[in-house]
């Protein structure tokens, strides 16, 4: 009897351990599904931006996107019970954060996308993690390793492969490339400022406040830049759909998914998945926008992704 009762108890413990093991595996699978979904959304955001720009002017598109996203983020923050008020000492950091991103970053990215392909834009933007250590070294005096240097060289080599044709011709507007690298610079500066406040606030609240403060910069700029064109704009259903997709999916859902994963597996492991964005964007652009991707361009994309892994 005693042996039987012990055997039953051991079986219960064994079953409990097996259940926990499988639950843990399902949770891990769920995390990876979440982060890949976030990367797919951000990859598609370049396609949506291209579609929205057929009707919207760049500044108006960004402002409308931020208004919708801010309302949704506020609702998510309140409903999840994670809403936090800003401490007075952090107000200047949030203003600086919003200046770099979304304000300067979106200006560079959106105007850049009016001049270059979605694929090239995603490849350049994907170099943000590569250049972050360089600025951290210059400003914060953080140590930069040889792997970081090698990653920068590889990534820039890959970008040049995507820009140039096999014949050596250059069919890209230089200003578009400059604007996209300006967006990269803004995002890297944003990451440096983010280190100052990230430990005190939930990620969701940081995204919410940077969107709200970003509107303080965007609304007057949009009125100055786009007001003369308000009466001449003609919106299509596809451009409005693209705006909603950018606002709901790219500015809210993808960030929430990414933040959830970062909390579980950390920033370093999460950022590895951003290497997928230019690959996904290239595939979407080829399938949906009929962008011509030569062998050299695919090699360039692979080189950029390799540089990201090395760094």
Go through each PLM region and give its residues.
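Alpha-helical transmembrane segments of compact multi-pass small-molecule transporters, enriched
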Residues: 45, 68-72, 124-138, 153-154, ...
